[in-house]
């Protein structure tokens, strides 16, 4: 075995990664890499083991591997739209699956419906919206230092077991004072939007494949996808 793919529910990711590092295996692991503080600290320790052993560890933050994003973000980092004023991030989609509770022990219920339990999933922001938030961090070359948010559980009725919320809105602040405005939702019969956008002093971009300037011709990515 040369490498392993870690794609189980993310609550198990840190212990699986630590075992793979102990066995000297290269790893591709899906996002998120962990769902809580202890898990993150374990992953950071495993990263150091990978460095010491010369192993490769790749994570499934997919936009960093998509050529249109790579080209567009590189231009944004070079100052194509001037100073970044604010960023927007969205993952608004339909309702998430639930496999029911009948005929199962409490632990079986949580395993079958892992997306609905925070200890194993991390909830929507951590498990899925991380893709969009990662684009903001990528552009800024930094992580937020503050967050102000709210959310709730509206579409998931009392007959749906679990702890997850189905909608969130969070405002993140980066060290230089730039804000990222975030929305994510998993509710049926609502408008969907999965996207990012950045507004600067000289233009704006969808972060993915185009940049529009206050003056001059826009940029459009036309290379390989």
Q: Across the structure, where does each feature detected by a protein language model lie?
A:
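N-terminal Rossmann-like NAD(P) cofactor-binding module of classical short-chain dehydrogenase/reductase
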Residues: 2-5
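Beta-strand-loop-alpha-helix segment that lines the small-molecule cofactor/substrate pocket
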Residues: 14-65, 79
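Glycine-centered tight beta-turn/hairpin loop motif at sheet-sheet or coil-to-beta transitions
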Residues: 175-179, 202-203
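Phosphate/diphosphate-binding loops
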Residues: 180, 186-188
């Amino acid at each position: 075995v040369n490498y392993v793919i870690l794609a189980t529910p993310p609550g198990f990711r840190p212990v699986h990664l630590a075992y793979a590092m102990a066995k000297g295996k290269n790893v591709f692991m899906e996002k998120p890499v962990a769902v809580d503080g202890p898990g993150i600290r374990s992953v950071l320790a495993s990263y150091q083991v990978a460095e010491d052993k010369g192993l490769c560890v790749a994570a499934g933050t997919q936009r960093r591997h998509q050529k249109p994003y790579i080209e567009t973000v590189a231009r944004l980092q070079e100052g194509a739209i001037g100073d970044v004023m604010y960023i927007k991030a969205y993952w608004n989609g339909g309702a998430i699956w639930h496999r029911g509770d009948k005929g199962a022990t409490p632990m079986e219920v949580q395993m079958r419906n892992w997306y609905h339990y925070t200890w194993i999933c991390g909830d929507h922001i951590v498990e899925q919206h991380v893709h969009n938030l990662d684009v903001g961090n990528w552009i800024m070359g930094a992580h937020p230092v503050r967050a102000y948010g709210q959310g709730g559980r509206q579409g998931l009725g009392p007959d749906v077991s679990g702890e997850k919320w189905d909608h969130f809105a969070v405002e993140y602040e980066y060290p230089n004072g730039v804000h990222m405005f975030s929305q994510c939702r998993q509710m049926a019969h609502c408008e969907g939007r999965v996207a990012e956008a950045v507004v600067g002093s000289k233009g704006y971009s969808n972060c993915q494949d185009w940049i529009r300037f206050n003056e001059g011709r826009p940029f459009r990515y036309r290379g390989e996808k």
